Swiss-Prot record:
The lineage of its organism: Bacteria, Pseudomonadati, Pseudomonadota, Gammaproteobacteria, Moraxellales. Coiled coil: none annotated. Pathway: Amino-acid biosynthesis; L-arginine biosynthesis; N(2)-acetyl-L-ornithine from L-glutamate: step 2/4. It comes from the Bacteria. GO terms for cellular component: cytoplasm. Belongs to the acetylglutamate kinase family. ArgB subfamily. GO terms for biological process: arginine biosynthetic process via ornithine; L-arginine biosynthetic process. It comes from Acinetobacter baumannii (strain ATCC 17978 / DSM 105126 / CIP 53.77 / LMG 1025 / NCDC KC755 / 5377). It is found in: Cytoplasm. HAMAP family: ArgB (MF_00082). The gene is argB. This is Acetylglutamate kinase.
Length: 302
């Protein structure tokens, strides 16, 4: 068989492998948190946008929630300013909040929208302020002191999601738009808050009863004590890995977000290596995926 026919057969096999997943997930909603290297590497940016457009084209309803911490840091540096962080959370005063709103709700959001549209999609940019999409309240971080007492730390204009206006999102997805959400929420008094994008994605997925929550990261997924990738975990197994210290440090918030989403009704959550081109498609439409799947039941395929 000529080489070009071999390549054609290989491509056909890939499509056949994807077919049952396309059929199973047609009409389903998935929420993708977009951040990390996938937002800063031009090749990965392009592959992500094409993945999202393909998902919409084959009948799924993707919703994108994006981060943008490095872009905010870069803009603050240009202004000769820095913002402190406590356990990875940005301390956000009013002046910093103005920059966060401008960068996340402006340049970063519009860049993602334009990229998806460039590849044939119909993306529409939103923040949590639009239509009161994301209701929020001030977040007080809890930190345990050496004596065991709990200290509450004020991070400024940092918030947590208290509600999601699902009708706003459903209006757009039912009209074949792809919502792209900046992680900014608003309280009843009109105060705007900077919210962790992972947490926003998880709450949006919960509120919509999404089929999948996909968190694109700069790691391969959840690793065991020997640093081997765990491709499938139940919520009970995740709880045990946290209790035994296998999951620790900076992974706990991300895994906790996925865990909360599944316990809140999302069918499965995926922690995926966003450094891999087309990671979103590979995780959804192939048998083994490229990350860790977390669900309420044991699964060997994605």
């Amino acid at each position: 068989m000529p080489q070009d026919q071999h390549l054609g057969v290989d491509k056909a096999k890939i499509l056949i492998e994807a077919l049952p997943y396309i059929q199973r997930f047609s009409g389903k909603t998935l929420v993708v948190k977009y951040g990390g290297n996938a937002m800063t590497d031009p090749e990965l940016e392009s592959s992500f946008a094409r993945d999202i457009v393909l998902l919409k084209t084959v009948g799924l309803n993707p919703i994108v929630v994006h981060g943008g911490g490095p872009q905010v840091d870069s803009f603050l540096k240009q202004l000769g300013r820095e913002s402190d962080r406590i356990d990875g959370m940005r301390v956000t005063d009013e002046a910093t909040m103005e920059v966060v709103e401008m960068v996340l709700g402006g340049s970063v959001n519009k860049s993602i929208v334009n990229l998806i549209n460039k590849h044939g999609g119909r993306a529409i940019g939103l923040t949590g302020q639009d239509g009161n999409l994301l209701r929020a309240r001030k977040l007080l971080m809890e930190k345990q002191e050496e004596d065991g007492s709990i200290k509450h730390i004020d991070l400024g204009m940092v918030g947590e999601v208290t509600g999601v206006k699902t009708d706003v999102l459903e209006m757009f997805t039912q009209s074949d738009f792809i919502p792209v959400i900046a992680p900014l929420g608003v309280d009843e008094k009109g105060n705007t808050y900077n919210i962790n994008a992972d947490l926003v994605a998880g709450k949006v997925a919960e509120a919509l009863g999404a089929e999948k929550l996909i968190l694109l990261t700069n790691i391969s997924g959840v690793l065991d004590e020997n640093k081997n990738l765990l491709t499938g975990l139940t919520t009970q197994e995740v709880d045990r890995l946290i209790e035994t210290g296998v999951i620790y440090g900076g992974m706990i918030p991300k895994v906790g977000c996925a865990l909360d989403a599944v316990k809140g009704g999302v069918v499965s959550a995926h922690i995926v290596d966003g450094r891999v081109p087309h990671a979103t498609l590979l995780e959804i439409f192939t048998d083994h995926g490229v990350g860790t799947l977390i669900s309420n039941r044991t699964q060997t395929t994605h």
